[in-house]
Amino acid sequence: MDVLFSLSKTLKDARDKIVEGTLYSNVSDLIQQFNQMLITMNGNEFQTGGIGNLPIRNWQFDFGLLGTTLLNLDANYVENARTTIEYFVDFVDNVCMDEMVRESQRNGIAPQSDALRKLSGIKFKRINFDNSSEYIENWNLQSRRQRTGFTFHKPNIFPYSASFTLNRSQPQHDNLMGTMWLNAGSELQVAGFDYSCAINAPANTQQFEHIVQLRRVLTTATITLLPDAERFSFPRVINSADGATTWYFNPVVLRPNNVEIEFLLNGQIINTYQARFGTIIARNFDTIRLSFQLLRPPNMTPAVAALFPNAQPFEHHATVGLTLRIDSAVCESVLADANETMLANVTAVRQEYAIPVGPVFPPGMNWTDLITNYSPSREDNLQRVFTVASIRSMLIK
């Protein structure tokens, strides 16, 4: 993997910097590095593809070295270099695609394609010029079963989940009380509602709670907490739990009371915040517990009192909610996030070449399925293919 990264980095630099008119002295170190790559690769043969519709391709390396010059690089020099660069870029692209579409239930962190296995040989270590990528650093750590750490922006840690629970219901669904939520990506929104606006509740207060268990531990997380759940602020028709009918939800939004958020790790509370909104932090957690209350307003203008009558029918439904967004966090496992396109790159290649479903990843690389059942085998394979996708992205956009 280090060799593949160094190949890609060298080729990217060569493609960007070996251009007509450049002073040789400005790129002499790069050209020496490029020539070392050629010396190491010359005389070797590789084969890629042969899975799904990814075609089999054979690669042979026998390229002349780039020369020296006292002046600027001329058109002939650059053209000769470009021919070599383009062949190598095509080779790296195909090695990456070959690796991205393969998976294994055992030791999925290790190279799976014949080409990358061959590049992992001792003879190619002379190409190892650079090891500065976060993905490469973590791949090396994971392959030695040492602790890794990825920094994510808006990590896709929440599997998609949209549902509701009813704490009070009737066959006619005309006086409901309960909780509804939408979890996806790095955001969760939860709303508590009571058609009667807590008219018969103790102290005219309804208590709500929402607990989310993460599939992976997050550390040093920066989080935004808001006293609102905008996705549940407009009318909608909702299918009943048994699918036999539908019921109407017509929210009128109130501010939640006694909001408390707890971040837990293995059942132990690590951080607690009460009535604190905006930016908060959580040190180390695998579970989030949100609790909040709906308080019937003790004093109401006639217009508000008309919204919340003391008896049925209840045409407007008192609703309180919270929004929690994980803006950034560190995780030992690789995840899809807002800054990276690795999941999209891997999925696109697998779809384009009709790669058959393997023993590890779900069909279509369905992220909700993948993160819900994030097994050690999936973790190893995902880290490997994301690392390869990051290498490929240096050359192929």
Curated annotation (Swiss-Prot):
Key words of the record: Calcium, Capsid protein, Intermediate capsid protein, Metal-binding, Ubl conjugation, Virion, Zinc
Pfam family, one: Rota_Capsid_VP6
A molecular function (GO) term: metal ion binding
An individual GO BP term: fusion of virus membrane with host plasma membrane
Annotated localization: Virion
Keyword tRNA processing applies: no
Positions with a binding annotation for Zn(2+): 153
Chief location: virion
One cellular-component annotation, GO: viral envelope
InterPro entries (alphabetical): Capsid_hemagglutn (IPR008980), Rotavirus_A/C_VP6 (IPR001385), Virus_capsid_a-hlx_vir (IPR008935)
UniProt binding sites for Ca(2+): 266, 286
UniProt keyword Zinc present: yes
Region (Interaction with the inner capsid protein VP2): 62-73
Processing and modification events after translation: The N-terminus is blocked.
Additional observations: The VP6 trimer contains a zinc ion located at the center of the molecule. The zinc ion is not essential for either trimerization or transcription activity of the DLP. Zinc-depleted VP6 has an increased sensitivity to proteases.
The protein's role, per its UniProt record: Intermediate capsid protein that self assembles to form an icosahedral capsid with a T=13 symmetry, which consists of 230 trimers of VP6, with channels at each of its five-fold vertices. This capsid constitutes the middle concentric layer of the viral mature particle. The innermost VP2 capsid and the intermediate VP6 capsid remain intact following cell entry to protect the dsRNA from degradation and to prevent unfavorable antiviral responses in the host cell during all the replication cycle of the virus.
Record's subunit section: Homotrimer. Interacts with the inner capsid protein VP2. Interacts with the outer capsid glycoprotein VP7. Interacts with the outer capsid protein VP5*.
Recorded family membership: Belongs to the rotavirus VP6 family.
Protein name, UniProt field: Intermediate capsid protein VP6
